[in-house]
Amino acid sequence: MLFRSPTKTGAVEKDLPEIIEAVRESERLSLIGLMTLPPFFDDAEKARPFFRRLHEMRDEIRRQGRFGDGRGELSMGMTHDYVIAIEEGATILRVGTAIFGDREKP
C-alpha cells in the first residue's frame, strides 16, 4: 500500500522486496503486476502521485526481471479517476460503476 487506510489492507511498499522474493521462490506463483487503490479524492488529479509511484515501482521491478510475464501489469484507476490512471500507465482498470451504475445501498 502506498498509504495507510483503516478500510483497506494490503502489502506496504517497504515489504515489496520480501514479497517478490517469496513469489520468486514459489513453484506455484508468478508475479504479473502491481495494484493500488489510492484514497478517494473529489479531485481525481490528487490520485496522480499514487499512480505515478506505482508506475515507478513497476519499472524498477521490471528492470530486475522479476515479473513472470515480463510486462508488469498496473492495476490502478476506478470510474472516478481512470483517465489519470491511464495517463500514468495503467494496463488494468476497475470501472464497474461506469458500466453497471452505482451499487444499491443496503
What are these regions (language model features)?
Residues 1-80, 86-88, 100:
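Conserved alpha/beta-domain cores
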Residues 86-106:
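C-terminal helical cap(s) of enzyme catalytic domains, especially alpha/beta-barrels
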